């Protein structure tokens, strides 16, 4: 089924709508699959938070709301579109639409506004559902976290790729959501070259921290990175 474009009317919804939606999502999650969430203790209780997760399936945002138990304003790339039967989700819950090639002033403004309201900003650093394994991150997540002086919360989601089809087959998918140790904020100040290098290094650290929450076969571009075992030990979560 071909993706359709995202309406321009999509924008972050009021807190009360997202709050009620989060409760609805919690109950729906009981039917979607057997969802195992690890690491809720790692969610900061206060302060600005940027949640960064891998993106293997359309159900990922839904599962992140289920796992975090708090409203999240997700950034979505308007060019990628969405499968028609999932359009209801961003229409009701809302999202921040962005251009895949740049982080414009309006995106920065909306993102900072989200954080000032005490909500979590949700970002998929890879830029969309691009691969069944991890790929290189775009610098947007780290950049927004740096200007907001926010803590970054790495999260992994797996097992939801066939969840939609399994629902109609009467099968509940086994889904795992792992929440890692928060890190940051970042300082990416300096010359253009220094800033670019800092963003690149911080983005790689972010993806390696997400990789540490996933089984080895999902590490993709980050397979064999020596920092992953260090983060795995730090998290102390099961990734099998």
Which role does the model predict for each range below?
Residues 39, 54, 76-77, 124-125, ...:
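A secondary-structure boundary/capping signal
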Residues 24-25, 92-98, 124-129:
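Short, basic, glycine/proline-bearing loop/turn elements
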Residues 2-39, 63, 84-93:
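A transmembrane-helix-recognition feature enriched in membrane-embedded lipid enzymes
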